[in-house]
C-alpha cells in the first residue's frame, strides 16, 4: 500500500475525535505488522494530537517522528520491573509470536508473551489507571465446524489443549480471561480486539 494512499484512507475512515490528545501511549510489538502501522498512524498522521508514543519491540524500528520513542527490548527476557517506569495513559499489547513456525519452536516464550506478560501489563495498568487493550486472535475459536462459519463472536471455540498449536491458541484464550477478570474484578478499563488474518 502506497504511503499517500494509506494516509488518505486513514484520514477518510478514522474520525479525529476518537484519537486521544496529549497522552502517553505504550505499544508492545511496535514493529510487528499491526504495530508499525499503529505507530505510524499515531505518531505521523495524527502528530498534531501531541501524543508521546513509546514502542517496545525486539526488532529494529525506524523513528517515525519526534514524538515516538523506540525501546529495543526482548520482552521474553524481562520482568515487569524492567518495563518503563512511566505512567502511561494507554497500554496496547501487540507483542507476540504469531507464526506457527516460531511458536512451535518457542512454546514457552509464546505462552509468556500472550498470557503472563499480559497479566504483568494489566497489573501496571491497574496501578496507573491506564486504558489497556489486549490484542487476541481468531485462533481462540480453534477449528469451528461448518455450522459455525461464519463464526459468531460468542462462539466458545473448538480448541485442543494438547498439540503443536495449543501453546498459541490456549495462551491467547488465557490472555482474554485475564483481561475479563481485570476489567470485571479490578475495574481496569480494558478491551479485547480479536483480529482475523491481516494482509
Language-model regions, residue ranges each:
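N-terminal Rossmann NAD(P)H-binding glycine-rich loop of SDR-like oxidoreductase domains
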Residues: 24-44
